[in-house]
Amino acid sequence: MWYHKLLHQQSRLQNLMKRGDIAHGLRLSGFKSLFPFSLHWCHTASKSVNCTWHQHEDHLELQYASTVMRFDYVWLRDHCRSASCYNSKTHQRSLDTASVDLCIKPKTIRLDESTLFFTWPDGHVTRYDLDWLVKNSYEGQKQEVIQPRVLWNAKLYQDAQLPSVDFQGFLETKEGLKKFLQNFLLYGIAFVENVPPTQEHTEKLARRVSLIRETIYGRMWYFTSDFSRGDTAYTKLALDRHTDTTYFQEPCGIQVFHCLKHEGTGGRTLLVDGFYAAQQVLQRAPEEFDLLSQVPLKHEYIENVGQCHNHMIGVGPILNIYPWNKELYLIRYNNYDRAVINTVPYDVVRRWYAAHRTLTTELRRPENELWVKLKPGKVLFIDNWRVLHGRESFTGYRQLCGCYLTRDDVLNTARILGLHA
């Protein structure tokens, strides 16, 4: 299961971090060295004697080393990387998939060292490196974690002693940006210090890593407790843990917070790793985890304040997983904005409430709560698909600014810097 892989990965990462060698670990072939199954496939190219196959009516059964894989013949023809089928400069397919005979079979198959050659009925030859087939097979993907993460509760995060990144280093050096993104990808939160306490500098910081996602709240939002928008965030009240924009079909990926001024008490920010809590549910009540990943819910935002009139609806389960490896990639949890439950029959509703209660209990455990006092100059980035946030009530005048970032662009920046994202 995905959490077993993450637990193993987390242990390896923590050992690397203790030795001050995390950057080395992150560079190793996109984290492959951190996974036991990736190690299994290393240096197998020379072991061609361990490669055998059997041709079935509609697919090839291939055993390479100790792994059995199955490839549909249409798939093998469609994924040909020859010059006439695939443009290696643009990394785009040239072959018209609809032109491939759905009953196609190779005339011959031969192995030359670590490469399989397929000759098709029309004479076209497709070649595949065995390691490429392993990496891209369904059986191989079932063992892969899409994004390595370190799951945490408050103590685990504090014990990691992750350093913040300085504003100038973040803006001016690849090393500073990469260090920030390493922390963010692994833990779902990251801080930048010594930022001038203005909206303009906060925007400059955000644009270093991503395009800013414009929403119904604008590009950069700036708010106090004046209830200028129809949202509890625009008050002095405490906010329970939640993820933002659950009422969007695609919730915003990253959230940026900068407290520009606070003349009063309270107002600490609450952070909870939703994936850590979900892991506890999966371990203790796997059937409830499954239910939370299967039942679609509506979340809704209705606003009629001043000139702001909006009615947003987003639909999706609380826990979102990749179907091929059951890896969790998004948690959509906001009890404020959850709409009427009318997407499942009555006999599922009670079981859903029980599962929701189990997850909520985990999210509310005091040991899972990380409390942070935001202050001018300290900017917080939150993975809104993973980490829930909230706040305690406060007194006095408090100004915050921030924005949402497009998740694709943050991950794109990370990949360009050589990180696994």
From Swiss-Prot:
Example of a GO biological process term: carnitine biosynthetic process
Pathway, per record: Amine and polyamine biosynthesis; carnitine biosynthesis
Cofactor section: Fe(2+); L-ascorbate
Cited Gene3D superfamilies: 3.30.2020.30, Clavaminate synthase-like (3.60.130.10)
Catalytic activity: N(6),N(6),N(6)-trimethyl-L-lysine + 2-oxoglutarate + O2 = (3S)-3-hydroxy-N(6),N(6),N(6)-trimethyl-L-lysine + succinate + CO2
Recorded superkingdom: Eukaryota
Top EC class, one word: oxidoreductase
Annotated keywords: Acetylation, Carnitine biosynthesis, Dioxygenase, Iron, Metal-binding, Mitochondrion, Oxidoreductase, Transit peptide
Quaternary structure and partners: Homodimer.
PANTHER family named in the record: GAMMA-BUTYROBETAINE HYDROXYLASE-RELATED, TRIMETHYLLYSINE DIOXYGENASE, MITOCHONDRIAL
Protein name according to UniProt: Trimethyllysine dioxygenase, mitochondrial
Gene name in the database record: Tmlhe
